[in-house]
Amino acid sequence: MAARPKLHYPNGRGRMESVRWVLAAAGVEFDEEFLETKEQLYKLQDGNHLLFQQVPMVEIDGMKLVQTRSILHYIADKHNLFGKNLKERTLIDMYVEGTLDLLELLIMHPFLKPDDQQKEVVNMAQKAIIRYFPVFEKILRGHGQSFLVGNQLSLADVILLQTILALEEKIPNILSAFPFLQEYTVKLSNIPTIKRFLEPGSKKKPPPDEIYVRTVYNIFRP
């Protein structure tokens, strides 16, 4: 039996959370080795385990994969979450890239100065409501299907759901003007593999707290 994927990252969301989401959506069990000290990072670097000297890193199928998007693409392609043809894969990739631009604001938010964090919440809300959510609302309204591409679950759906739910933690009514996205979010959240991931006790990480921020600084600051 093939070894389970092993994820190397601090014990928090960051750029690894999307990987956790996609593995969970695909129904793949995985292990985690949490980085807690600089010494653990140096050991990975000195052992030539990190191609570009940085995490996230995922051990899977005999490989040590780095670079978040490459990891996501590999897992999605392996588990039929990356479309049935070139056109579908291109659409999925385009939607994922746009959503990751929005998600990046959430990833960096806990590392801002306290005075800047509330301003950034306003900025995130504006970008979501004006730039990103109208695009996905139009797509769902236009084709009348349950998923963004090919009428089946894809990487694009998983990353968008992750981003929507993370935004709702900060802005509970963020979808109030988007009825199709509201329905879409409920449907996706009830897919059995995703529903299990959203339940207490799963490997889904909680919102970043001061302990996580301090740990990240201690590991990665020069």
From Swiss-Prot:
Enzyme Commission (EC) number: 2.5.1.18
Positions bearing N-acetylmethionine: M1
Domain GST C-terminal positions: 85-208
GO MF annotation: an example: glutathione transferase activity
Tissue expression as described in the entry: Expressed at a high level in brain, placenta, and skeletal muscle and much lower in lung and liver.
Keyword list, A-Z: Acetylation, Cytoplasm, Transferase
Protein name in UniProt: Glutathione S-transferase A4
Gene name linked to the record: GSTA4
